[in-house]
Structures are given as structure tokens and as C-alpha cells.
Design a protein with these regions (language model features):
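Signature of the catalytic double-stranded beta-helix
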Residues: 1-45, 49-52
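Residue-level signal for beta-strand positions within conserved beta-sheet cores that form or flank
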Residues: 34, 70-72, 129
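Residue-level detector of short, conserved catalytic/binding motifs and their immediate flanks
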Residues: 36, 57, 131
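Catalytic core of non-heme Fe(II) oxygenases with the double-stranded beta-helix
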Residues: 39-113, 123, 139-151
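Short, cationic low-complexity segments
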Residues: 81-88, 153-172
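Ligand-binding loop in jelly-roll beta-barrel domains
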Residues: 119-132
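An acidic/histidine-cluster motif and surrounding catalytic segment
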Residues: 136
Length: 172
């Protein structure tokens, strides 16, 4: 669908801008959406805190909710032992403005982008029909200037082969 293509391109542009301008990361080319999914939360629905593995950035696009009645904020938590590469084994425990819990109360039509390893979720929904679209991003090329790797989408047979090899299953 052409509308989804335009929306996807816009999301990728926003994620690339976030990576370069907010995170300060050196992204040689662009970022790409690797997967998307819809979240529908009726009254009483909630999302346990979680992070997204095997991903660089994640985003939530808020599609539908009644801001005055139904919306609960998305919260983000960053423990004092937050893993960051390279991982350093240091004693931590001090809460600062950078590792405290934060909440984001977004409006319909807003896109929130964040590092995928950041825990996030939301408490019990008080209304009906809270709909959001979530997605993950990866850079098309990851490099330090001397070496790197290219992130590509695998077709169905490539995914099956990679899974079978990982699980030690015979290739059929």
C-alpha cells in the first residue's frame, strides 16, 4: 500500500534523525524498519516492562485513544546497571536524571523513538481501544570506519536456514 510506504519512509527518516541528532551515533547510510506490529489494548489491558532484543532503535506510533479519558502514559525505566556497549563492570547504584524512571504522555499521531534496550511498558488502561503501532529499526550498515557489516532483510528460506543452523537442525 502506497500510504504505508510513505508512513514507513517517514518513520525511517525520523529514526535516522534521532540516531544522528539525539544519540549522536555515526550512521553511515540509513536505518530501516525491520518489523512492525499493532497493539490493541482494551480496558484493563497493560504491558509489562520489556525491551527489544536484536534491534537498535524502537518506536511507538500512537494511533487511537481518547486523550481526555482513556490514555495512560508509556513509562521508560533505565536501571543503574543498564547495559551499554562496551559493557563496563563498575559499581553503580546512584539514580541520576539519565537513569530514573520517566513517563511519556503522548497524543494521537505522535511517534516516540527510543533505544531498543530501554525497558518500557504501560500500566492498566482505563479506557477502551488504545491502539498503537510499534516497530524496530536497524542501521543498513554498522561500521567503525575500518570494518562493518550490512543489515539485510532475509527471505523466508534464508530465515528458515538461519534458524535451523542455530538450532542444530538438518537442512531440508
Amino acid at each position: 500500500d502506497e500510504r504505508y510506504g510513505r508512513f514507513r519512509n517517514w518513520c525511517e527518516q525520523q529514526a535516522e534523525s534521532y540516531a544522528k541528532e539525539v544519540k549522536g551515533d555515526y550512521i553511515q547510510e540509513t536505518v530501516q524498519v525491520t518489523d512492525t506490529w499493532i497493539n490493541i489494548s482494551d480496558k484493563g489491558g497493560y504491558q509489562y516492562p520489556h525491551h527489544h532484543a536484536n534491534s537498535y532503535l524502537s518506536a511507538i506510533y500512537y494511533v487511537n485513544f481518547d486523550m481526555a479519558r482513556d490514555h495512560v502514559p508509556t513509562y521508560f525505566t533505565r536501571d543503574t546497571n543498564f547495559i551499554n556497549a562496551p559493557a563496563l563492570n563498575v559499581i553503580t547504584g546512584k539514580t541520576t536524571e539519565y537513569n530514573q524512571n520517566n513517563e511519556v504522555l503522548s497524543n494521537e499521531g505522535e511517534l516516540v523513538i527510543f533505544p531498543s534496550q530501554l525497558n518500557h511498558g504501560y500500566d492498566e488502561n482505563t479506557g477502551y481501544n488504545r491502539i498503537s503501532l510499534s516497530m524496530n529499526f536497524m542501521p543498513t550498515i554498522v561500521t567503525n570506519g575500518d570494518y562493518g557489516w550490512r543489515c539485510v532483510n532475509l527471505n523466508q528460506s534464508e530465515r528458515k536456514k538461519a534458524f535451523d543452523e542455530k538450532e542444530g537442525l538438518p537442512n531440508n
